């Protein structure tokens, strides 16, 4: 399973990139708004740091405007993937953009059937939201498992991006469920690095070394 980072914070992306684990980035209007910067400027800088799919979301709600925005965003860099919300107008836009050779990531997926429709419309990626489903008492990982099984059964090559990831267990569950990608906040990536026994082991090694050599 590939690891993307879910942020528009350039410094977080730069730090995570240095770990050598990033294969892509997902952004959304809320994340970019937090940065208080021009969207094109932010996306260009992100593309200069990570050589992989960079999801940039349209703001429009009508197909024609989604397509127009998508085409403009795609001009920023060859790695841009256009993020489209799951809705009727969104599916229409995905079909048009796919016919133009522009990759899309259909977001706000909350059911396997939504994922199937998005894939058949031509989406390159679908993004089921784990955390938000958990919030309403529906285990988010269940739909990731169902989508992965359905895509494998029918030979669908659309990639699954586990999104709305809140903790390391979401990442582990996604990997075991067959998700192709998990897009993860920076703080969760850092949590994945840590384990109490790793820290204790490092401390013990240093103590033993210093004791042996009287340091």
Curated annotation (Swiss-Prot):
It is found in: Cytoplasm. Pfam families: TAL_FSA (PF00923). It catalyses: D-sedoheptulose 7-phosphate + D-glyceraldehyde 3-phosphate = D-erythrose 4-phosphate + beta-D-fructose 6-phosphate. It comes from Clostridium perfringens (strain SM101 / Type A). GO terms for biological process: carbohydrate metabolic process; pentose-phosphate shunt. Keywords: Cytoplasm, Pentose shunt, Schiff base, Transferase. Transaldolase is important for the balance of metabolites in the pentose-phosphate pathway. It comes from the Bacteria. GO terms for cellular component: cytoplasm. Belongs to the transaldolase family. Type 3B subfamily. The active site is at 83 (schiff-base intermediate with substrate). Its EC number is 2.2.1.2. PANTHER family: TRANSALDOLASE (PTHR10683:SF36). This is Probable transaldolase. Pathway: Carbohydrate degradation; pentose phosphate pathway; D-glyceraldehyde 3-phosphate and beta-D-fructose 6-phosphate from D-ribose 5-phosphate and D-xylulose 5-phosphate (non-oxidative stage): step 2/3. GO terms for molecular function: aldehyde-lyase activity; transaldolase activity. InterPro entries: Aldolase_TIM (IPR013785), TAL/FSA (IPR001585), Transaldolase_3B (IPR022999), Transaldolase_3B/F6P_aldolase (IPR004731), Transaldolase_AS (IPR018225), TSA/FSA_arc/bac (IPR033919).
